[in-house]
């Protein structure tokens, strides 16, 4: 589980689209005929400590398993998430949100994200204000019934409050210290609606 508080921003260093499946402790992670990409991500030094193979980490809100580490580079093998999330659209040089899963006893309060993405949505509008940035996001039609004002939603791994809803669009407000500078109109984001996962 994750708190929805991004701990750092990584950079995609390499994408191997012809990757072979890897194993941890002799156990295959994926079926041998699975479509697979390996993503190498440069981690910030302050969150790299203690990262080991087998650890669960959220990348843009998607729960992935570390398969290899080499200095500042952490590798993930990605299978189903290529089609179900935005990870299949990443390019070398892209920025990604990173959060380690919390350990037993670390969680305070009832908020959490599972790292299982509910759908992919589109950023349709940015509104710059004095103390925050307002973002309007267009959700897939089949998820609109689960959108509720003043409830929480995960957007690329960031736990945020839905401030307003218009049809299948919803609005979130970002504090200035929330670093999402590389997002723009037209960007696609992973969303997780905790209500569907039973987290509300």
Swiss-Prot record:
Its transmembrane ranges are none
Compartment list: Cytoplasm
Spans of Lumazine-binding repeats, please give: 1-111, 112-200
Q: What does this protein do?
A: Blue fluorescence protein (BFP) that can bind 6,7-dimethyl-8-ribityllumazine, riboflavin, and 6-methyl-7-oxo-8-ribityllumazine as a bound fluorophore. Has no riboflavin-synthase activity.
GO terms under biological process:
bioluminescence; riboflavin biosynthetic process
The protein depicted here goes by the name Blue fluorescence protein
The record's PANTHER family line, in alphabetical order, gives: RIBOFLAVIN SYNTHASE, RIBOFLAVIN SYNTHASE ALPHA CHAIN
Describe its partners and assembly state.
Monomer.
UniProt-listed PROSITE patterns:
LUMAZINE_BIND (PS51177)
Give one GO term, molecular function aspect: riboflavin synthase activity
Keyword Protease tagged:
no
